[in-house]
Amino acid sequence: SDGGRLTKMLNYYVKKGDILNPRRGIYTKRSFNAEELACSIFHPSYLSLEYVLKKSGVIFQYDSALTSVSYLSRTVDISGQMYSYRQIKPELWLGGEGIMQKDNIYIASAERAFLDMVYLSAGNCYFDNLRPLDKRKIKVLIPSYHSKSLEQHTKKILNI
């Protein structure tokens, strides 16, 4: 069958070292985009939490892991790169509000990543620099989470 032939070809190129097989059913070129891979390992998922907050200058602690939000919680090591996923309820995907898409990469805005972090940590989190965050955008996103505790924690953290 064509599927069997394709599998044999893929296995041949993996053994030869021309392509990588980081996870079952996922094949990449040797030089792959780590952000794109993060969004492909578990689907649907989007980059968020510490990864986005670090890139946005909201937290300063160095962590090389790519952190994402998905339908399950897992940590995966691929070629020494850690990919960490935190589970969030599907209804909190908010129809993509605060999630940007570029090619095959889905990434939360800093405001969305902030709210995801506060929501998942029940407010037990620390932020080094809140200036990059747009409080108006946060206020618009908060009601979509349907969480009074998120609202309270956010108001306390942002002093609003």
Predicted ranges, named:
Residues 58-111:
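Exposed, interaction-prone assembly regions rather than primary DNA-binding/catalytic cores
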Residues 33, 89, 118:
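A broadly conserved detector of short glycine/acidic/proline-rich loop/turn motifs that flank catalytic sites
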Residues 18, 57, 119, 123:
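Hydrophobic/aromatic-lined pockets within catalytic cores
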Residues 96-160:
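Hydrophobic alpha-helical interaction segments
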Residues 1-46:
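Short beta-edge/loop segments at beta->alpha junctions of small alpha/beta modules
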